[in-house]
């Protein structure tokens, strides 16, 4: 890879590692210089907009967060959260989609932030409950996903996730325990690594899919293999619910 970068020629990579080159090519990381990528994006976007089989909403229930990661690009707004009026408007929108998309097969509700679980009971749960009940006993496949730091997950929320068709969460670790706790800490003397790992394991045991996204640097890469020890307590039958990215 370094050789191809230095030579500014991806064909150098093909000579060294054919499989890696083919993977980059198939995923469009490597694109022929004659391909109009802007036009391709426009075509994909048009196709998505016109697809009445699938509808996807992403909601930021708050721009506040319980961490202050140094690299975060979000502007945290303390105490910000969806108003009752906005929650009702979202529910109305979901109902309109259901009634105006006769070919609708899949409805995906994604939660982002800020930290989407921060005001879960008053913002997220009412919408989740409404959407689930709206699509229950219909031909539409409803499901929901979260991008979360994982700290606020507990068994009560997992029960809700199972009940309301939450089938996927993405949770980030900043490397191994020491590195992670230097970035994501609960207080001056308490890190978050152990609690988040335990929550990830709890999700897997309850058969909810989790992608563990690992942020890495030169320092975190040195200890990255130690992460496996923390997840060794998971039964083999539950490992299929974990993906490391």
Which positions does each model-derived feature cover?
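Active-site neighborhood of divalent metal-dependent phosphoester/pyrophosphate hydrolases
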Residues: 114
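Short, charge-rich binding segments
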Residues: 47-51, 62, 71, 137, ...
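Short amphipathic alpha-helical interface segments
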Residues: 1-22
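Conserved, mostly hydrophobic/aromatic
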Residues: 65, 69, 111, 171
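Canonical Radical SAM [4Fe-4S] cluster-binding loop centered on the CxxxCxxC motif
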Residues: 51-52, 56-87
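Radical SAM/AdoMet-radical enzyme domain recognition
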Residues: 91, 95-110, 119-245
């Amino acid at each position: 890879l370094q050789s191809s970068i230095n030579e500014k020629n991806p064909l150098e990579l093909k000579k060294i590692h054919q499989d890696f080159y083919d993977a980059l090519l198939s995923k469009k990381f490597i694109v022929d210089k004659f391909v109009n990528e802007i036009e391709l994006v426009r075509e994909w976007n048009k196709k998505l907009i016109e697809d009445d089989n699938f509808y996807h909403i992403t909601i930021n229930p708050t721009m506040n967060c319980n961490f202050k990661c140094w690299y975060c690009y979000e502007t945290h707004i303390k105490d910000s959260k969806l108003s009752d009026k906005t929650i009702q408007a979202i529910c109305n929108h979901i109902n309109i989609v259901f009634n105006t998309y006769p070919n609708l097969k899949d409805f995906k509700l994604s939660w982002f932030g800020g930290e989407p679980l921060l005001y879960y009971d008053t913002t997220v749960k009412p919408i989740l409950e409404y959407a689930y009940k709206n699509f229950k006993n219909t031909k539409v496949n409803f499901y929901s996903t979260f991008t979360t730091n994982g700290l606020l997950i507990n068994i009560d929320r997992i029960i809700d996730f199972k009940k309301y068709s939450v089938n996927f969460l993405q949770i980030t670790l900043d490397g191994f325990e020491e590195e992670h706790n230097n970035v994501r800490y609960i207080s001056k003397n308490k890190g978050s690594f152990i609690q988040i790992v335990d929550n990830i394991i709890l999700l897997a045991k309850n058969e909810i899919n989790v992608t563990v996204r690992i942020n890495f640097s030169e320092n975190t890469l040195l200890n990255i293999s130690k992460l496996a020890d923390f997840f060794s307590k998971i039964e083999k039958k539950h490992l299929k619910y974990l993906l490391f990215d």
